[in-house]
Curated annotation (Swiss-Prot):
Its main location: nucleus. Keywords: Chromatin regulator, Nucleus. This is Ubinuclein-2. It comes from Arabidopsis thaliana (Mouse-ear cress). GO terms for cellular component: nucleolus; nucleus; rDNA protrusion.
Length: 717
């Protein structure tokens, strides 16, 4: 009766091999025992029910299994459960009446496959006892905890009997810090809301339903599971189509979003089925964003958040939601730097979007950030975009159009999350279309200017290059003598093309047109421009470095010219200021009123002194002219001996001459009036200081008059 056990393969024992392990029945009075041979150096897996079935078949039905004994003990219960005639196989496959066994069997099948519980619990179970995953009233928290797998090692080893929860070895401090991070990443990768959780459970149930035995009786549950799997596939099929057709058609901007005008309570049947999960979306989204910000920046995020954003967008009937914009940020793949520091290397578009977000956050008042959700969902009239925000938005549109060729829907959702409190989505699309149209026209004008200047350069080279080549041939013919330098043997003559100023100006203009509107860090494109321009010269007369040096020389000339123009403008401003200062006032000179007697005396003396001053003025002028002529003669003699000093003097003379040319023609008249008023004020001061001493006044007026000599006391009387 006893058979030899079948040894398993190298892959380890399976559940199919456990049923083939032989057993031996031992009887001791009323007790019946099963003897099983254990495999050497391998784990023996035993199914109690299958061993009982084999023993009963081998003994001719003398050994009855436990379920049969229970059913035969209560015939009334048996009649209620199955009023018809039942065969022996149906009695053997009758499930346990406990409902939790069906749930446990399903969970085991998810992890252990088709033979998880050896097919001994739920081969013909009624469908009404299945776990209803679509019921929103049932709390799935414990079920989710059951799905979590703890990979920590067990404390005890070997064969042991345990009661209660298994004791596990606590990980070290370092692994304890790393394990919650991994769990947080898994939780952040999970989509927010019960709608996607239910679809995940549906997919798992559909997977287990596909692995069941096809011989089982098809009931309503199999149809329901197959329908659920179809609905899950249909729910994810628009995601693929939307990822393919996610671009914005800029020509049809005038279409209006009808979903924006619908009320918030008008939801689809899917949203009614998951109505309890709606208020949890903002909290979950903020939690996921916080967890993703704590994760290291070098690792890429999974694309599950993008799918959840699209599912939630279908639930809200196209309403622009802040959660979509915040979660779409996490779906962007960030490439990691190849260096050892591990800092993320952002693209130019990502940098422009971050700068726009930073600018909007700085310009936004703090009160508006608290009511951000209300501002996004409200359909009130919103303010326009500020000037600096519009400039940054145009930069984002230009970079996106240059790199992608269009503005994608994902980018519009992200921009709406940044500037949604300032502008509506229709206005944003219209502004982006206007910006792109202006960019296209500017690029066309830039291309036409670039080609025109390039054609002018080629025309100039057609006339200059043959002249240079002819000069080189003449020089080679003139230097071809019988004697040749030893050091020049084996060296090819160096050809050098000398550019003139006009050609350098054209090259600089071409460079300015090429660089116009270009972003930073564009050194590779500029080097490519140098190489393309160098190819215009035949026989490699000019290389990239000479092109760059020619452009730099022209830039230096332009900067020097701008500096000279600025100096000339400053000089003209100074001369104009001097002219305004030299213009006299029309009002006469007024003196303070003191006593009337002093005024009379001053007027009398003033008339006498003015006449004397007018008389002596020509004599003083003639003496001044003579001294000036003598001084000029001395300077001429010294300049003949020192020509460098003469050059300096000529430059100094030209500057005042230029200033005098700018002065008006009435300058001599103004100077004469100024000299006369100066003399009047001087004589008036002299009269006030010494009013009594008339001899002293005459001495001041006539300084060359002879003073009276005192009498000599030594002379005889």
């Amino acid at each position: 009766m006893e058979d030899e056990p079948k040894l398993p393969t190298d892959d380890g024992p399976t559940f199919n091999e456990s049923c083939k392990i032989s057993s031996e029945i031992l009887t001791a009075g009323d007790r019946k025992l099963l003897k099983v041979e254990l495999l050497k150096e391998e784990t023996t897996l035993v199914s109690w029910k299958k061993l009982m079935d084999e023993a009963s078949k081998e003994n001719g039905g003398l050994f009855v299994s436990a379920p049969e004994r229970l059913l035969n003990a209560n015939p009334n219960l048996e009649f209620r459960l199955a009023p018809g005639a039942q065969t022996e196989n149906e009695m053997v496959n009758q499930p346990h009446p406990n409902r939790l066994n069906s749930v446990i069997a399903k969970i085991e099948r998810l992890y252990m496959g088709k033979d998880g519980s050896d097919g001994e619990e739920l081969d013909g179970a009624p469908d009404d006892d299945d776990y209803d995953t679509e019921d929103s009233f049932i709390d799935d928290a414990e079920l989710d905890e059951y799905f979590e797998v703890d990979n920590s090692p067990i404390k005890h080893d070997g064969f042991f009997v345990n009661r209660g929860k298994l004791e596990r070895i606590e990980p070290s401090a370092t692994s304890n810090q790393q394990q919650p991070k991994k769990r947080r990443r898994k939780e952040s990768a999970k989509p927010c809301g019960d709608v996607v959780d239910v679809s995940r459970k549906r997919a798992k149930m559909a997977k287990t339903a596909g692995g069941k035995d096809q011989s089982a009786s098809p009931g309503p549950s199999s149809k329901k599971i197959s329908n659920d799997s179809k609905t899950v596939q249909d729910s994810f099929s628009p995601l693929k189509a939307q990822n393919g057709n996610d671009s914005l058609v800029l020509e049809n901007v005038k279409h209006t979003d009808k979903a924006n005008h619908q009320p918030m309570n008008a939801t689809s049947p899917k949203s009614k089925a998951a109505g309890s999960s709606g208020p949890l979306h903002p909290k979950c989204s903020s939690k996921s964003v916080h967890e993703q910000s704590n994760s290291p920046p070098g690792k890429s995020r999974p694309n599950v958040s993008a799918k959840s954003a699209v599912v939630r967008q279908q639930v809200n009937n196209g309403m622009p939601d802040l959660d979509i914009a915040t979660e779409s940020k996490t779906s962007i793949q960030i490439s990691k730097k190849s260096g050892s520091n591990g800092r993320p290397k952002y693209s130019t578009l990502e940098k422009a979007i971050r700068n726009l977000e930073k600018l909007v956050a700085e310009s936004r008042p703090p009160a508006a950030t608290e009511n951000q959700d209300a501002d996004i969902s409200s359909q009130a009239v919103k303010r326009g975009l500020p000037g600096d925000v519009k400039l940054h938005l145009a930069k984002v549109a230009r970079i996106a159009y240059a790199s992608q060729g269009e503005i994608s829907g994902e980018l519009i959702n992200r921009l709406m999350g940044i500037v949604g409190h300032l502008i509506q989505i229709r206005s944003l699309k219209r502004n982006l279309k206007i910006m792109i149209d202006s960019i296209v026209t500017a690029n066309r004008e830039k291309d036409t200017r670039f080609q025109r200047i390039k054609s002018e350069i080629t025309e100039m080279l057609k006339t200059q290059v043959p002249l240079v080549e002819s000069q080189e041939t003449n020089q080679e013919a003139g230097t071809s003598d019988d004697f040749q330098d030893v050091g020049s043997l084996g060296k090819s003559p160096v050809k050098k093309f000398v550019m003139d100023v006009a050609l350098e100006e054209k090259l600089c203009d071409l460079y300015d047109v090429f660089v116009e509107g270009m972003d930073e860090h564009s050194g590779s494109q500029i080097r490519k421009l140098y190489s393309d321009l160098a190819q215009l010269w035949p026989n490699s007369l000019v290389d990239n470095h000479e092109i760059r040096r020619a452009i730099c020389r022209e830039k230096e000339r332009r900067r020097a010219l701008e500096g000279n123009i600025g100096k000339e403008m400053d000089q003209t401003k100074i001369t104009k200021k001097k002219q305004t200062q030299l213009v006299p006032k029309s009002e006469g000179i007024t003196y303070p009123d003191k006593t009337s007697g002093v005024e009379v005396k001053a007027s009398v003396v003033l008339t006498a002194t003015t006449t004397s001053l007018v008389d002596c003025q020509p004599a003083a002028d003639s003496s001044f002219e003579r001294s000036k002529q003598q001084h000029e003669k001395l300077k001429r003699t010294s300049s003949l001996s020192n020509p460098a000093a003469e050059g300096k003097k000529v430059r100094r003379k030209t500057e005042p001459a230029l200033e005098e040319t700018h002065l008006p023609a009435e300058k001599p008249l103004v100077l004469a009036l100024k000299r006369q008023t100066h003399l009047k004020s001087k004589t008036h001061k002299q009269v006030q200081v010494h009013p009594q001493s008339k001899a002293h006044k005459q001495a001041q007026v006539h300084p060359k008059a002879k003073t009276q000599t005192p009498p000599d006391l030594n002379l005889p009387s």
